[in-house]
Amino acid sequence: MMEPPQTRLMINVFIVSFLALLVNLVVGVLGADNYSRDDFPLDFVFGSGTSAYQVEGAANKDGRTPSIWDTFAYAGYAHGENGDVACDGYHKYKEDVQLMLETGLDAYRFSISWSRLLPNGRGPVNPKGLQYSNNLINELISNGIQPHATLYNFDLPQVLEDEYGGWISRDIIRDFTYYAEVEFREFGDRVLYWTTVNEPNVFALGGYDQGNSPPRRCSPPFCATNDTMGNSTYEPYLAVHHILLSHSSAARLYWRKYRDKQHGFVGISIYTFGIFPQTNTEKDRVASQRARDFFVGWIMEPLQYGDYPISMKTNAGERIPAFTNHESKQVKGSFDFIGVIHYTNLNVSDNSDALKNQLRDFTADMAANIFGEDLFSNEEYLITPWGLRQELNKFKLLYGNPPIFIHENGQRTASNSSLQDVDKGEILHGYIGSVLDALRDASNIKGYFRMAFPGFVRVARWIQVSFGLYYVDRDDPQLKKIPKLFCKNGTTGFLKGRRTSILDLFELEQDPITCSKSPIIFSKISKWVLASLLFLIQHKIKFMWREPLPGQIPLKLVMF
């Protein structure tokens, strides 16, 4: 018996509605689905990056002196690892640049070793250190790759740490400004993008509150270690205060003496999270905003408005330094761009009871419980690109829509994991799609840097984790670099103009060797939706959508 037309119509409407809902779900979760390099502005750059200590090696050669990273590693706090060899970028920079060229990168973000360039922290320049940085920069430019240089990435010369305590002393402002001028003078004719300090918020918390990264200062009961050197209740605030003053001193020096001749830009990078309330209660919503004040506003509010967030000043009291009127004016507006570092999201609940404690550190002052990824785990991050889009929109709304580079993003895997890294492709596809969505929201994003190139040594508690586009064979005397699957078939293809979609990732996972297309059985839309559904189920992803952006479907979907 034939079905009545009304029944068939209702069935068709249901199928179409279901498919539309699923499409909206997947695109909302993973960001823009089908896109190519051509969908981004012409001046938008795609790059990768790393840091000097994690990639250069040659730690004891050609005049370089120890940094606080060396001291940390040699003391046994890096699970037996150190940066003595790393990826041997000091000797293999030409090979690395050729790999960048083959990958299709527009830009390379790297840091310069302070103790290699200025072995005494200040004073005479080391000719060998100068030559290495010049060689790297020239090699990049000769291959059409834009250099983005970071002045400081956790590697203060140990001599300055020994002399006056490094970042907890105001003397650092003088020495950092001197160091910055050496870099501007020597390399500024070719380097246009300068990041003064990499993720000062994370550096301060790890180095001065928990003590699990250099310079390993903390005090009980807040230490993650057995050390008792330092004071966790105020040193994180003091270190960031001096970082902000050092940054602004260097930025204004550049603007005053070099910008008109070199036409470059100075910024700073910040580690961010997508921060969402654990429940819909008023207390948790307020706590999530307070957590963002502490993580991001700690750096951005002085740069944008000249002072720390009110919540920080209220909860930390006299333990957080105050800016003088002159310092406030110097710090306010002292950036041309902001580097955003983003990997994952956090959920937050209120913990105002922590404020009753007389002895408090940064975490207690924040008065919030944090739920989310274990930053020291080998487990892969959940795929949560909507958090990045939300964060980019907050920069637009709260801080005047500054020029932004995504300075770090990527997926962590065990360092000995398979080269068939389709999971990295999934997260990269989602996050680049989220950046494209944010651009369409009118966020002022200038570039996206994947972490890391080629790979790097993680000298901290998370040593077994790799973020690299290439696998570096540490057992090979030549440190052979092998491209991972998605680098070969995803990143390179996208950067060279090929369109990418979630369907490509599904097909790549089904046939990672040939990346061949499966037979066309369904219509294009049905096949795309099927791939999307299988993608969501197969990977047992847990999505929690707490504060949807306008036009998106609010939901809480927990799968397995």
UniProtKB/Swiss-Prot annotation:
Highly expressed in uninfected root nodules. Detected in leaves, stems and roots. Belongs to the glycosyl hydrolase 1 family. One of its GO terms (molecular function) is hydroxyisourate hydrolase activity. GO terms for cellular component: peroxisomal membrane. It is a single-pass type I membrane protein. Residues 1-31 form the signal peptide. This is Hydroxyisourate hydrolase. The active site is at E199, E408. Keywords: Disulfide bond, Glycoprotein, Hydrolase, Membrane, Peroxisome, Purine metabolism, Signal, Transmembrane, Transmembrane helix. Disulfide bonds join C218-C223. Monomer. Its EC number is 3.5.2.17. It is an enzyme of class 3 (hydrolase). It is found in: Peroxisome membrane. GO terms for biological process: carbohydrate metabolic process; purine nucleobase metabolic process; urate catabolic process. The chain crosses the membrane at residues 518-538. Involved in the conversion of hydroxyisourate to ureides such as allantoin, the major form of nitrogen transport in legumes. Pathway: Purine metabolism; urate degradation; (S)-allantoin from urate: step 2/3. InterPro entries: Glyco_hydro_1, Glyco_hydro_1_N_CS, Glycoside_hydrolase_SF. Its main location: membrane. It comes from the Eukaryota. Residues 539-560 are cytoplasmic. It catalyses: 5-hydroxyisourate + H2O = 5-hydroxy-2-oxo-4-ureido-2,5-dihydro-1H-imidazole-5-carboxylate + H(+). The keyword Transport does not apply.
